[in-house]
Regions:
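C-terminal boundary of histidine-terminating zinc-finger modules
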Residues: 100-122
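Cell-surface, membrane-associated systems
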Residues: 89-93
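C-terminal alpha-helix
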Residues: 126-142
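Broad hydrophobic/π-residue packing in well-ordered secondary structure
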Residues: 77, 95-96, 128, 134
Protein backbone atom coordinates (compact mmCIF):
# COMPACT_ATOMS: atom_id res chain seq x y z
CA UNK A 1 0.00 0.00 0.00
CA UNK A 2 1.32 3.41 -1.00
CA UNK A 3 -0.25 6.39 0.75
CA UNK A 4 0.35 9.77 -0.83
CA UNK A 5 -0.70 12.79 1.25
CA UNK A 6 -1.61 15.74 -0.93
CA UNK A 7 -2.00 19.28 0.35
CA UNK A 8 -5.12 20.87 -1.06
CA UNK A 9 -3.28 22.91 -3.66
CA UNK A 10 -2.75 22.75 -7.40
CA UNK A 11 0.93 23.40 -6.69
CA UNK A 12 1.10 20.00 -5.00
CA UNK A 13 -1.30 18.43 -7.51
CA UNK A 14 1.25 19.27 -10.20
CA UNK A 15 3.46 16.49 -8.80
CA UNK A 16 0.73 14.01 -9.75
CA UNK A 17 -0.41 15.50 -13.05
CA UNK A 18 -0.20 18.56 -15.21
CA UNK A 19 -3.46 20.44 -15.52
CA UNK A 20 -4.67 23.33 -17.65
CA UNK A 21 -4.83 26.92 -16.37
CA UNK A 22 -8.51 26.54 -15.43
CA UNK A 23 -7.73 23.57 -13.20
CA UNK A 24 -10.14 21.36 -15.08
CA UNK A 25 -8.38 19.42 -17.84
CA UNK A 26 -5.60 16.97 -17.06
CA UNK A 27 -2.92 17.32 -19.72
CA UNK A 28 -0.65 14.48 -18.62
CA UNK A 29 1.04 12.65 -15.77
CA UNK A 30 3.80 14.27 -13.76
CA UNK A 31 6.96 13.04 -12.08
CA UNK A 32 5.40 11.32 -9.06
CA UNK A 33 2.72 9.51 -11.06
CA UNK A 34 5.34 8.34 -13.53
CA UNK A 35 7.46 7.01 -10.65
CA UNK A 36 4.48 5.05 -9.29
CA UNK A 37 3.68 3.77 -12.80
CA UNK A 38 7.26 2.52 -13.18
CA UNK A 39 7.12 0.81 -9.77
CA UNK A 40 3.86 -0.87 -10.75
CA UNK A 41 5.41 -2.15 -13.96
CA UNK A 42 8.43 -3.53 -12.10
CA UNK A 43 6.19 -5.31 -9.60
CA UNK A 44 4.09 -6.80 -12.40
CA UNK A 45 7.22 -8.03 -14.21
CA UNK A 46 8.42 -9.64 -10.98
CA UNK A 47 5.05 -11.38 -10.55
CA UNK A 48 4.22 -9.43 -7.40
CA UNK A 49 0.83 -8.09 -6.42
CA UNK A 50 -0.20 -4.65 -7.61
CA UNK A 51 0.48 -1.55 -5.55
CA UNK A 52 -2.64 -0.26 -3.82
CA UNK A 53 -2.11 3.47 -4.28
CA UNK A 54 -4.17 5.79 -2.10
CA UNK A 55 -4.14 9.59 -2.31
CA UNK A 56 -5.22 11.39 0.85
CA UNK A 57 -6.04 15.09 0.86
CA UNK A 58 -4.24 16.79 3.70
CA UNK A 59 -4.69 20.06 5.60
CA UNK A 60 -8.17 20.70 4.26
CA UNK A 61 -9.72 24.03 5.16
CA UNK A 62 -13.11 24.13 6.84
CA UNK A 63 -14.50 26.73 4.45
CA UNK A 64 -16.26 25.86 1.23
CA UNK A 65 -14.10 27.34 -1.51
CA UNK A 66 -14.05 27.13 -5.31
CA UNK A 67 -10.44 25.89 -5.31
CA UNK A 68 -11.32 23.11 -2.86
CA UNK A 69 -14.14 21.91 -5.12
CA UNK A 70 -11.88 22.10 -8.20
CA UNK A 71 -9.26 20.03 -6.38
CA UNK A 72 -11.83 17.40 -5.47
CA UNK A 73 -12.98 17.11 -9.11
CA UNK A 74 -9.40 17.02 -10.40
CA UNK A 75 -8.37 14.29 -7.95
CA UNK A 76 -11.45 12.20 -8.73
CA UNK A 77 -10.83 12.53 -12.48
CA UNK A 78 -7.16 11.69 -12.11
CA UNK A 79 -7.88 8.68 -9.90
CA UNK A 80 -9.94 7.11 -12.69
CA UNK A 81 -7.30 7.93 -15.26
CA UNK A 82 -4.17 6.63 -13.52
CA UNK A 83 -5.61 4.18 -11.01
CA UNK A 84 -5.45 5.26 -7.41
CA UNK A 85 -8.02 5.27 -4.65
CA UNK A 86 -8.86 8.28 -2.56
CA UNK A 87 -9.39 8.20 1.17
CA UNK A 88 -10.70 10.77 3.63
CA UNK A 89 -7.96 13.12 4.72
CA UNK A 90 -7.28 15.46 7.58
CA UNK A 91 -8.55 18.96 8.16
CA UNK A 92 -6.14 21.70 9.15
CA UNK A 93 -5.99 21.41 12.94
CA UNK A 94 -3.86 23.03 15.61
CA UNK A 95 -3.46 19.69 17.41
CA UNK A 96 -1.40 18.27 14.54
CA UNK A 97 0.95 21.26 14.61
CA UNK A 98 1.30 20.98 18.39
CA UNK A 99 2.04 17.26 18.44
CA UNK A 100 4.35 16.94 15.45
CA UNK A 101 7.43 18.77 16.86
CA UNK A 102 7.21 16.53 19.93
CA UNK A 103 7.09 13.37 17.81
CA UNK A 104 3.58 12.59 19.01
CA UNK A 105 0.28 11.65 17.39
CA UNK A 106 -3.36 11.80 18.40
CA UNK A 107 -3.02 8.30 19.81
CA UNK A 108 -0.42 9.52 22.32
CA UNK A 109 -2.69 12.01 24.09
CA UNK A 110 -3.65 9.66 26.95
CA UNK A 111 0.00 8.75 27.47
CA UNK A 112 0.96 12.39 27.99
CA UNK A 113 -1.78 12.98 30.55
CA UNK A 114 -4.63 14.41 28.47
CA UNK A 115 -7.72 13.22 30.32
CA UNK A 116 -10.49 14.89 28.34
CA UNK A 117 -10.41 15.62 24.62
CA UNK A 118 -11.84 18.84 23.27
CA UNK A 119 -14.26 18.72 20.34
CA UNK A 120 -11.53 19.42 17.78
CA UNK A 121 -9.43 16.52 19.10
CA UNK A 122 -12.44 14.21 18.98
CA UNK A 123 -13.09 15.24 15.37
CA UNK A 124 -9.41 14.68 14.52
CA UNK A 125 -9.54 11.16 16.00
CA UNK A 126 -12.63 10.44 13.92
CA UNK A 127 -10.75 11.57 10.80
CA UNK A 128 -7.99 9.12 11.72
CA UNK A 129 -10.54 6.31 12.20
CA UNK A 130 -12.10 7.10 8.81
CA UNK A 131 -8.70 6.98 7.13
CA UNK A 132 -7.76 3.67 8.74
CA UNK A 133 -11.08 2.14 7.64
CA UNK A 134 -10.62 3.43 4.08
CA UNK A 135 -7.16 1.87 3.83
CA UNK A 136 -8.74 -1.59 4.13
CA UNK A 137 -5.56 -3.10 5.54
CA UNK A 138 -5.91 -6.77 6.50
CA UNK A 139 -6.22 -7.28 10.24
CA UNK A 140 -6.23 -3.56 11.03
CA UNK A 141 -9.19 -1.83 12.62
CA UNK A 142 -9.46 1.54 14.35
CA UNK A 143 -10.27 0.39 17.86
CA UNK A 144 -9.35 3.58 19.66
Amino acid sequence: TLITPLNDSFIDFDLLAHIDANGEKITGPSVYSEMVWNARQLRAQAGLSAIDWIVVRNRLGAQRMVNKEKMERAINNLSKRIGFRTAPGFNERVIFRELFPRGLTLLDLKDIGVKQLNISNIAARQELRDLIKALELPGVSPDF
